[in-house]
């Protein structure tokens, strides 16, 4: 489990997570809970083909995808908590 679980009750303006797709999708509800309204979450460490899965999970957690970048087969997704 990620360190975000150890910080229950605190809210953050920005979280960066460079982990694989499976961990990101598993921990995304905790990231969403830890983000303050209007906060940003940058996720990387996964493949381009995983972007639709990451975006769908983000939306399900109340996070709005606002930017995707890809390079050499790797991806980064930036989401914002509404």
For each predicted feature, which ranges?
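A short glycine-rich, Lys/Arg-flanked "PGG" loop and its adjoining helix->strand segment in the class I
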Residues: 25-40
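Conserved class I S-adenosyl-L-methionine
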Residues: 48-61
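Short, small-residue-biased leader/transition segments that mark boundaries at the very start
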Residues: 1-5
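A short SAM/SAH-binding and catalytic strip from SAM-dependent methyltransferases
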Residues: 13-25, 45
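A short acidic, Gly/Pro-enriched loop at the edge of an enzyme's catalytic core
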Residues: 6-14
């Amino acid at each position: 489990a990620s360190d975000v679980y150890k910080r229950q009750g605190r809210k953050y303006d920005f979280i960066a997570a460079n982990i694989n797709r499976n961990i990101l999708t598993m921990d995304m509800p905790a990231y969403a809970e830890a983000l303050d309204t209007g906060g940003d979450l940058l996720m990387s460490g996964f493949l381009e083909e995983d972007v639709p899965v990451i975006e769908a999970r983000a939306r399900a957690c109340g996070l709005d995808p606002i930017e995707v970048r890809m390079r050499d087969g790797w991806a980064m997704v930036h989401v914002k908590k509404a």
